[in-house]
């Protein structure tokens, strides 16, 4: 503060300071103010930063008048001590005590004006009134200026404070602090009104007004903030005054319709305007404004570099004026680089757009062009761009437009020519544009011919390409090498992705792929598509770096893709948003993150994830050190926070902490990567190696005594291969350990240590030079202070301590930070090298072992063929069966190994090993299918056996080189497939020869034909949901309990008159009647007619049966084991012709154990053993049953097959007889038991088979070549007599139990499902009187279909089962 005049008392000065407490008083002078002409009064002049105050000489002090420095229009010095100040409100004349006081006041006013207005300010004249001097320039750039160096950011804070004082408003110190601190620290020359949007409109207006006099800021930015009229007026004022504002952004600022007209006028007023970027998007602007603006743009000498008029409601008329301006002003052709006219519907739909097309067709400098949503014709626009925009255009957005040419016609040549000629294009957006198929083909063809582009982003989302577009992409995309990012979202591809995804994988330049909203398919097809996608990203040469399936609603099936991320090494970014995968998907993602080391970014939201799912992710990130970014799942986090706020907050903080940790350089756990890769490399091939080595060792032992020299050479080579195979197990860990040991003191670490030492020396030398230079400069500027400091020896010693950098810091920065990053990358490369070497060696060993195995197996087969004596075991076999016997060993080698051992199969197994298996929660998984089939009474092994039979075949071509040339009968591989029923039997010249189906690795026949016969006859309605099926539901009897009232009421439904059908075979362990089944009675001792057959000769070295003990223990009743009766039908003929017999009939068969529970009733069923072999039969019966077998060979096929003749009409009972159902069934069961011991005629045999087919539809008679044994002829039963309801029929001599026991003769050997006690089964047989001269058919109650459907289930539920067996049994074959 300047020294106050001596005439002023201390009390007055303090009173003035107290009065001006808001501002510091810089000067106080006692002056004489001219109140009237030539009349002066004493006053006190007080000067503050921006204002001059006049006080009377009174205490307490009060302000008499004041004015701001900005109100000064002229400041004149009339004499040595008199000044004249002209203000907006009048003139002030005053005399100061001395000339020194005049100079002080003059310098203060000049300095204040220079701070507010850096340019030439007001004029200050000095001299007498008669002889005035010339003007004195007090601007800061002039020599006479007394202003000091400007403050930060061009003095914005001072200008803002002066304007606040001028307008009488309070100065916001926060504005000054933000500008002086934040803007200055960032060197930011963009004044953003959003930073101060919390203030009032008048405060914003003052800030904008301050920019008019500021030369630091060059850009005024405001977006999505509605500006008031006061602010907009100051914007126009700033543009009219500023000479440094280059860019104006008023995006969605609420501009009035006349603002552009005023803006055009401002451009005309300010000749020094340097504005070159104008952004007025998202403001309603009328055509008047555009017309005025176009006229002013004609006068811009340098043109505009950026013009954005998106969504401004501009009409084609305004666009025409703008286009004419572009063409008339040549400066725009070289200056305009950014043009945005998007979101103006109909703008380019008329002929007024030709003016803009003409400008685009001329050579120009456009780099960014956005015409999305303007209804322009894409083909016409590309024709204009072809001539003028090929050299500089990098961004082209033509979304939400259309093409002018019609569908079916050829695309204009501009499509292909433009995309083949453009040089710098990097982004093309054609989303929501209906591209005809021809235009899409032309686009892809043009890109395929362009050799200048690379990493192009092509957006074809929402183009409704569908199947035709998918086909075009498959055909053309493989030849396009410039596309680095492809967006195909929401195109309705759906099932076409099955073929499109593999085609996308063939393009190795593709790095980023977007496939969201294309999965609107059924569950089965969706799983196939996801498996194709998994196969794509698991390829070793996959080029994808990011994959997006956002908003696809994959739900739980997202886990199919997630399971492949664990071992994936190519993807660095994945987007799983909008799929609703819930917590179980988050759990699968956590498992993938635990072992993944390539993902850097994960985007996921809208997946219905709760706090529990986020907890799984947090736990996974504890062991993941490579994931850097995870998008904030706003939707899921907010939903989880509502239910569990504390847990959600803790879990998300934990996730963020892990991500922050991963963004710093650190040591990656290489041991985890080693163990993971070791498991993927070794476990997939180790099992195959073990099995191959075991097989080759057996063959070597079998051929070790062979004297042939070639065989011995091969044996020696095989032994060497086995040694290599054993050593290969230690190859992967040995190579990894070797690389780890050599890397500890390798050249990289040594070089880093030497570099650290050299850097430390260089740092010390540089600091020494800097210190000396600073000290010398300080001596020049402040020599006295330096001499004093050196005398005290303080400064240099303190500086010397500060200018040293610790050596351990430099060493840690190089070795622990940069060196650690280098070491991590080096470890990854070493691991990939070890993996490649191990894979290559193991593949070679597998190939050589397999070839050696095939060669030794061929030698072994030839030796066995030569050693078989003529007329031996193979005597009596047909040529086809002998050929199969000779080729048996060679055929089973691959299948027993599980797959063909070739490169394709090995790679497939490794890829499958890298993918996590499907979880049980996904519907359609094998586990769920097993449980569903088990609930329906189908054995659990059925589905797994079917799946195994379908997947064991490999895509191998090895077998093509080993086709037999002689001695074997060639058969087509599809000959064994099930076929639909034939309406006519085959002719005599074309006998039906059974063909054995393909085998699985355990020797069993495949189950591909399971369910085929039931498929052609099954009804649409499912009857399993209304009532449970038991064995009693097949035929009602007298012993059933009465139905409860609720069940009786349910039976009155609409569909309960229909007759239920049984499943194939008996129920599984979960059936209600599984515990009621009892084992059959022991068969009688063997007789001469059925001698026991010897064990079949093995075809290999101690070959085991067709199934293992575990599989044998899982056999189910009615299925002949887990393979079912189809296996028995396929294998029966081959076993019989090979001379294989069944186990001795005199041996009682023990109950099988399934799942730890003994299942009774698993004895030999209907003449079939568990080995799939028919009991011995008499050849005399073959001729009489040959025709019957031909008719019955396709009974399972369906409705078109042969049926037994219906009973005569006279045998059908009347309605009164229908009411005696229980007695009739009881007699029918006794008659059927007695009749089973009789000699069957063709008609009766057909009847038995028809009865058996209902309960056991798969248990059919073997193939035509099987021979039947004639059973012993016994007495026929008497004709049944109808018994009234409620009475018991008269007992036949011999009893029912004896009759049923006699049916277990070797000839019949029919399965039983008895409910009686064990004592009933041990009773001796009895004979009853029979009629020898009468042939009777199996007795059935002849009832109408409606009566059968109404009564068949009711007796079954009336009475509980009798454990004593008194109430009789139900024969399964009576249906």
From Swiss-Prot:
Residue spans of biased composition, Basic and acidic residues class: 1007-1022, 1219-1229, 1348-1360
Highest rank taxon of the organism: Eukaryota
Keywords linked to the UniProt accession: Cell membrane, Cytoplasm, Leucine-rich repeat, Membrane, Repeat
Biased composition (Pro residues): 981-997, 1078-1097, 1272-1281
GO biological process, one term: regulation of postsynapse assembly
LRR repeat windows: 244-264, 274-295, 303-323, 335-357, 365-386, 392-413, 424-444, 455-475, 482-501, 509-530
Subcellular location: Cytoplasm; Cell membrane
Location of region: Disordered: 124-151, 864-901, 969-1375
Family stated for the protein in its record: Belongs to the CARMIL family.
Designated name of the protein: Capping protein, Arp2/3 and myosin-I linker protein 3
UniProt gene name: Carmil3
């Amino acid at each position: 503060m300047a020294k106050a005049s001596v005439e002023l008392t201390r009390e007055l000065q303090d009173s003035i300071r107290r009065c001006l407490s808001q501002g510091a008083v810089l000067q106080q002078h006692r002056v004489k103010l001219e109140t009237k002409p030539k009349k002066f009064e004493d006053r006190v002049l007080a000067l503050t930063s921006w204002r001059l105050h006049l006080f009377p000489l009174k205490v307490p002090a009060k302000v008499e008048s004041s004015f701001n420095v900005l109100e000064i229009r002229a400041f004149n010095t009339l004499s040595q001590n008199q000044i004249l100040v002209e203000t907006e409100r009048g003139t002030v004349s005053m005399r100061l005590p001395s000339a020194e006081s005049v100079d002080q006041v003059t310098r203060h006013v000049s300095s204040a004006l220079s701070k507010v207005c850096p340019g030439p300010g007001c004029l200050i004249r000095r001299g007498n009134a008669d002889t005035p001097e010339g003007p004195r320039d007090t601007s800061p750039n002039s020599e006479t200026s007394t202003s000091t160096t400007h403050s930060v950011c061009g003095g914005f804070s001072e200008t803002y404070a002066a304007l606040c004082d001028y307008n009488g408003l309070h100065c916001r110190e926060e504005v000054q602090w933000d500008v002086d601190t934040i803007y200055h620290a960032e060197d930011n020359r963009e004044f953003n009104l959003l930073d101060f949007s919390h203030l009032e409109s008048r405060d914003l207006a003052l800030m904008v007004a301050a920019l008019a006099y500021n030369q630091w800021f060059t850009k005024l930015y405001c977006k999505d903030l509605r500006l008031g009229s006061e602010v907009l007026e100051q914007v126009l004022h700033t543009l009219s005054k500023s000479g440094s504002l280059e860019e104006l952004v008023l995006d969605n600022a609420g501009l009035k319709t006349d603002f552009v007209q005023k803006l055009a006028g401002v451009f005309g007023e300010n000749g020094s305007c340097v504005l070159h970027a104008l952004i007025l998007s998202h403001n309603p602007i009328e055509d008047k404004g555009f017309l005025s603006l176009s006229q002013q743009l004609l006068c811009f000498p340098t043109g505009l570099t950026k013009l954005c008029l998106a969504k401004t409601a501009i009409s084609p008329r305004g666009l025409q004026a703008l286009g004419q301006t572009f063409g008339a002003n040549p400066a725009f052709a070289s200056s305009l680089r950014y043009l945005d006219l998007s979101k103006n519907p109909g703008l380019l739909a008329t002929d007024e757009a030709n003016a803009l097309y003409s400008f685009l067709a001329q050579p120009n400098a456009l780099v960014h062009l956005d015409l999305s949503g303007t209804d322009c014709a894409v083909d016409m626009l590309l024709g204009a761009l072809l001539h003028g925009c090929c050299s500089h255009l990098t961004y082209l957005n033509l979304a939400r437009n259309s093409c002018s040419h019609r569908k079916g016609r050829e695309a204009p040549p501009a499509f292909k020519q433009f995309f083949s000629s453009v040089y710098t294009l990097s982004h093309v957006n054609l989303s929501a544009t209906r591209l005809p198929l021809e235009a899409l083909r032309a686009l892809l063809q043009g890109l395929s011919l362009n050799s200048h582009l690379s990493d192009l982003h092509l957006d074809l989302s929402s183009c409704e390409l569908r199947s035709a577009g998918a086909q075009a992409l498959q055909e053309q995309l493989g030849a396009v090498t410039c596309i680095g990012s492809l967006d195909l979202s929401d195109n309705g591809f759906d099932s076409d992705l099955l073929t499109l995804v593999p085609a996308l994988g063939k393009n190795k330049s593709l790095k980023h792929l977007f496939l969201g909203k294309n999965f609107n398919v059924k569950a089965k097809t969706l799983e196939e598509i996801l498996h194709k996608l998994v196969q794509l990203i698991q390829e070793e040469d996959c080029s994808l770096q990011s994959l997006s399936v956002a908003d696809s609603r994959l739900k739980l099936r997202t886990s199919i893709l997630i399971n492949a991320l664990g071992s994936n090494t190519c993807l660095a970014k994945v987007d799983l948003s909008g799929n609703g995968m819930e917590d179980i998907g988050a759990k699968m993602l956590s498992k993938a993150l635990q072992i993944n080391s390539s993902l850097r970014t994960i985007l996921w939201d809208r997946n219905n994830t709760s706090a529990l799912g986020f907890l799984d992710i947090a736990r996974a990130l504890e062991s993941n050190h490579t994931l850097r970014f995870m998008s904030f799942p706003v939707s899921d986090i907010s939903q989880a926070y509502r239910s569990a706020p504390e847990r959600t907050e803790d879990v998300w903080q934990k996730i963020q902490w892990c991500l922050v940790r991963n963004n710093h350089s650190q040591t990656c756990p290489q041991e985890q990567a080693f163990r993971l890769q070791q498991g993927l490399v070794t476990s997939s091939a180790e099992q195959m190696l073990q099995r191959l080595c075991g097989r080759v060792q057996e063959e070597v032992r079998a051929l070790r005594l062979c004297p042939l020299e070639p065989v011995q050479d091969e044996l020696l080579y095989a032994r060497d291969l086995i040694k290599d195979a054993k050593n290969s197990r230690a190859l992967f860990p040995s190579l990894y350990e070797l690389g780890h040991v050599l890397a500890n003191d390798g050249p990289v670490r040594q070089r880093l240590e030497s570099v650290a030492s050299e850097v430390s020396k260089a740092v010390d030398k540089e600091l020494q030079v800097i210190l000396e230079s600073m000290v010398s400069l300080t001596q020049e500027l402040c020599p006295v202070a330096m001499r004093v400091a050196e005398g005290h020896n303080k400064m240099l010693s303190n500086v010397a301590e500060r200018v040293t950098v610790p050596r351990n810091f430099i060493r840690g920065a190089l070795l622990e930070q940069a060196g650690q990053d280098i070491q991590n990358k080096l470890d990854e490369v070493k691991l990939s090298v070890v993996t490649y070497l191990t894979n290559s060696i193991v593949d070679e060993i597998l190939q050589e072992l397999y070839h050696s195995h095939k060669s030794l197996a061929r030698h072994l087969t030839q030796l066995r063929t030569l050693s078989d004596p003529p007329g031996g075991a193979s005597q009596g076999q047909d040529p086809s069966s002998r050929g199969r016997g000779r080729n048996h060993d060679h055929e089973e080698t691959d299948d027993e190994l599980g797959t063909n051992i070739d490169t394709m199969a090995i790679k497939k197994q490794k890829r499958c090993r890298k993918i996590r298996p499907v979880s049980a929660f996904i519907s359609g998984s094998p586990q769920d299918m097993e449980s569903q089939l088990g609930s329906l009474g189908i054995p659990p092994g059925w589905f797994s056996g079917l799946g195994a039979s379908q997947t064991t075949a490999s895509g191998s071509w090895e077998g093509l080189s080993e086709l037999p040339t002689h001695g074997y009968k060639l058969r087509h591989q599809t000959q064994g497939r099930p076929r639909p029923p034939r309406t006519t039997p085959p002719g005599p010249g074309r006998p039906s020869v059974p063909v054995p189906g393909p085998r699985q690795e355990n020797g069993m026949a495949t189950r591909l034909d399971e369910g085929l016969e039931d498929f052609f006859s099954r009804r649409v309605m499912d009857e399993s949901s209304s009532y449970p099926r038991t064995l009693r539901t097949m035929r009602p009897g007298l012993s059933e309990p009465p139905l409860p009232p609720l069940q009786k009421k349910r039976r009155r439904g609409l569909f309960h008159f229909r007759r239920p059908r049984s499943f194939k075979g008996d129920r599984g362990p979960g059936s209600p009647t599984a515990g009621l089944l009892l084992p059959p009675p022991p068969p009688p001792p063997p007789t001469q007619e059925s001698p026991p057959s010897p064990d079949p000769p093995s075809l290999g070295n101690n070959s085991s049966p067709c199934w293992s003990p575990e599989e044998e223990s899982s056999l189910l009743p009615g299925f002949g084991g887990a393979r079912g009766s189809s296996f028995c039908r396929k294998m029966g003929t081959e076993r019989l012709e090979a001379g294989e017999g069944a186990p001795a009939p005199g041996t009682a068969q023990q109950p099988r154990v399934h799942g730890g529970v003994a299942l009774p009733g698993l004895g030999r069923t209907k003449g079939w053993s568990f080995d799939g072999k028919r009991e011995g039969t008499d050849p005399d019966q073959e001729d009489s049953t040959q025709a019957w077998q031909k008719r019955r060979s396709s009974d399972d096929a369906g409705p078109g097959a042969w049926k037994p003749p219906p009973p005569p009409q006279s045998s059908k009972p009347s309605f009164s007889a229908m009411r005696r159902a229980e007695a009739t069934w009881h007699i029918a069961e006794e008659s059927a038991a007695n009749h089973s011991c009789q000699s069957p005629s063709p008609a009766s045999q057909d009847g038995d088979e028809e009865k058996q087919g209902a309960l056991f539809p798969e248990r059919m008679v073997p193939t035509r070549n099987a021979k039947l044994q004639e059973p012993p002829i016994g007495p026929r039963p008497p004709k049944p007599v109808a018994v009234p309801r409620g009475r018991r029929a008269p007992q036949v001599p011999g009893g029912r139990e004896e009759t049923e026991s006699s049916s277990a003769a070797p000839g019949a050997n029919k399965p039983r499902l008895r409910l009686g006690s064990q004592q009933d089964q041990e009773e001796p047989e009895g004979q009853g009187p029979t009629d020898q001269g009468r042939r009777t058919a199996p007795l059935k109650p002849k009832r109408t279909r409606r009566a059968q459907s109404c009564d068949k289930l009711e007796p079954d539920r009336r009475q509980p089962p009798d454990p004593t067996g008194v109430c009789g049994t139900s024969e399964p074959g009576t249906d």
